[in-house]
């Protein structure tokens, strides 16, 4: 397994972020395709410069994130969101990552859920775009069980869909992050290393520094390895007052385990 970090966890602009990732001794970085890195703003010259900056820092792009204000299950103004994701997928292929991460919306087991046809058709179209271009759209885990997500994938005739497995998201939504790995073993193309504490009577579930939450990382990483996952394990820290220090501590923590 290869270790990386999300640029957004560092709270730094792109160039300074690359230098910090190199200082931390990590091999990869995930970046959101927003601002100057947005597909509609990144020129061919910009793409060449981005690839050069990555190479000069000895880094690989692990994936592009594609933040959406609304999921792909929301019918209002849906087509522009589909087009946006499609553009980011194509950009991810051009930049060598080939993986785009998206929070698509909740996958419901209810046959009469009115949002599901929109989600299904959107993801089928995007997955088939991935089939044609060699890119993969990775759905972020957390809102449904691994078995529910697998069952949903099995209804779609495309190999262009995968999973970004985020154990903390699952834990905070009441799912066991280890038990839910196996159903998705053939779909996991990218993973986040993020920790969390379970909800208690006196508090809500919350993110925690890596190694400071309720996830059994030795068991989790051991299970990932047993399932023959050899891809990226990318540290993500979304809260905290000193996230760079938390990331550095997380790097040291993971290196003791992988």
Residue ranges, per PLM feature:
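Acidic/histidine-rich catalytic cores of soluble enzymes
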Residues: 3, 28-29, 61-64, 121-214, ...
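N-terminal pre-domain/capping segments
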Residues: 1-93, 158, 251, 255-258
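Active-site acidic/histidine proton-transfer and metal-coordination neighborhood
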Residues: 13-19, 53-56, 60, 70-163, ...
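Charged helix-capping and loop-helix junction motifs
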Residues: 42-49, 78-86, 112-123, 175-180, ...
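Residues at the N-termini of beta-strands
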Residues: 28, 99, 190, 231-232
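Active-site beta-loop-alpha junctions enriched in small/polar residues
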Residues: 6-10, 32-34, 66-69, 105-107, ...
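H/E-rich (His + Asp/Glu) clusters that bind or coordinate divalent metals
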Residues: 219-220, 225, 232-233
């Amino acid at each position: 397994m290869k270790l990386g970090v999300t640029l957004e966890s560092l709270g730094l602009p792109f160039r300074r972020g690359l230098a910090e990732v190199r200082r931390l001794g990590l091999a990869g970085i995930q970046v959101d395709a927003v601002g100057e890195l947005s597909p509609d703003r990144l020129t061919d010259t910009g793409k060449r410069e981005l690839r050069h900056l990555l190479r000069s820092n000895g880094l690989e792009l692990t994936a592009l994130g594609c933040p959406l204000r609304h999921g792909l299950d929301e019918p209002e103004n849906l087509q522009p969101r589909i087009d946006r994701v499609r553009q980011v997928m194509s950009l991810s292929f051009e930049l060598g990552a080939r993986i785009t991460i998206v929070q698509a919306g909740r996958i419901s087991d209810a046959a009469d859920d009115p949002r599901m046809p929109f989600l299904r058709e959107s993801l089928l179209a995007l997955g088939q775009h991935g089939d044609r271009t060699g890119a993969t759209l990775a759905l972020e885990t957390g809102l449904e069980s691994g078995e529910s997500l697998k069952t949903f994938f099995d209804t779609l005739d495309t190999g262009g869909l995968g999973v970004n497995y985020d154990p903390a998201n699952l834990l905070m939504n009441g799912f066991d992050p280890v038990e839910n790995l196996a159903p998705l073993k053939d779909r996991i193309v990218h993973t986040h290393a993020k920790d969390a504490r379970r909800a208690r009577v006196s508090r809500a579930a919350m993110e925690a520094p890596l190694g400071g939450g309720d996830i059994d990382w030795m068991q989790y990483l051991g299970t990932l390895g047993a399932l023959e996952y050899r891809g990226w394990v990318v540290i993500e820290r979304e809260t905290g007052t000193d996230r760079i220090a938390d990331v550095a501590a997380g790097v040291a923590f993971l290196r003791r385990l992988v």
